[in-house]
Design a protein with these regions (language model features):
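Histidine-centered active-site/metal-ligand motif
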Residues: 32, 130, 197
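Non-heme Fe(II)/2-oxoglutarate
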Residues: 21-101
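Eukaryotic charged/polar low-complexity linker/IDR segments
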Residues: 146-148
Length: 307
């Protein structure tokens, strides 16, 4: 493997491309792979130590108030480790490396990190099942791959925050695969109209209440994609979490069930409020004429594509 990999990718990972490619191609419910100890251990540690403070990132919700999620897109503005990562993932050698694993040629790096970069989530946060936006907003490239590296040392099995992969959340509300967000674990998967993914609620115990779920999200594109995968341009498409199978007629609700149902109702209420607010803004923009419409559309575009 090229010297460009030295000190960043674990040599044991870089030396088994053929095995990784076979695993990737055969994975269900859609093509993906989990690679433990993905990065050089010291480099992964440097990324964690230089991870931006929660308050430094974009931590405002759609309502404009601080939330339980913070993202920082322009990672090249962070410490030396992030600058090295930024240089590395745009190099031809790395793009060809993940291209060999996934079978996708001509992969492109996103210099804007739209929707990507560092992601940090506090206890109580979850992410509903969704498929991602499918075209780069400014370049028009096809979005092809998600690569996530987790930076959570000592993460407990029952702390939630597990990446969930679905066949179809409309038909089956239970994930087909659950992946713990363990330190230096990489998850690489296709971005298609069928790559439904989420993470379940983070439930940190009192002794770990100061911790957060940390990850780095990298997205890759191409100028073309197979005709059978091409779809109309859309933003991120969410499906609200469904009622778990164990909650049915005759079931006695546990405190955790009640908390879950309250969160689900709050999520739906929040969605309705956002839709009503968006509709109201659109009507007001229409009343203001062309300039008002343009300002409204730009605001909505920003909110939807930063997710």
């Amino acid at each position: 493997m090229a010297s460009n990999f030295d000190g960043i990718i674990n040599p044991g990972v870089a030396s088994r491309i053929a095995d990784l490619a076979r695993s990737y191609q055969s994975a269900e419910p859609f093509r993906h792979i989990v690679i433990d100890d993905f990065l050089n251990e010291q480099f992964a540690g440097a990324l964690l130590s230089q991870f931006p403070a929660f308050e430094k990132g974009n931590n405002l919700g759609d309502d404009g108030a601080p939330g339980r999620k913070s993202t920082f897109e322009r990672i090249s503005r962070l410490g030396e480790a992030y600058q090295a990562l930024d240089r590395f993932i745009q190099a031809k050698e790395f793009l060809e490396f993940i291209g060999e694993i996934t079978g996708i040629d001509g992969l492109l790096y996103d210099p804007f990190y739209l929707g990507g970069g560092t992601h940090e989530n506090r206890s109580g946060q979850a992410l509903h099942a969704h498929v991602d936006f499918n075209y780069h907003p400014s370049e028009g490239w096809h979005r092809r791959l998600n690569l996530i590296v987790y930076l959570n040392q000592g993460w407990g099995e029952d702390w939630g925050g597990n990446l969930e992969l679905y066949r179809d959340p409309y038909q089956d509300p239970q994930p087909a695969v659950k992946i713990s967000p363990l330190f230096n674990r990489c998850v690489l998967f296709d971005t298609t109209e069928k790559s439904w993914h989420a993470f379940d609620p983070i439930t940190l115990p009192a002794e770990a209440a100061n911790l957060t779920r940390k990850s780095i999200a990298l997205y890759f594109y191409s100028r073309h994609r197979p005709a059978e995968e091409v779809a109309g341009k859309h933003t991120t498409h969410y499906v609200n979490r469904q009622i778990p199978d164990h909650i049915k007629a005759g079931h006695t609700l546990a405190p955790s069930d009640v908390a879950l149902l309250r969160d689900m109702i709050a999520d739906r209420d929040g969605l309705l409020q956002r839709l009503y607010a968006e509709n109201s803004e659109l009507r007001q923009a229409q009343d203001r004429g062309l300039s008002g419409k343009l300002i409204y559309l730009l605001k909505r575009y920003f909110v939807r594509f930063r997710k």
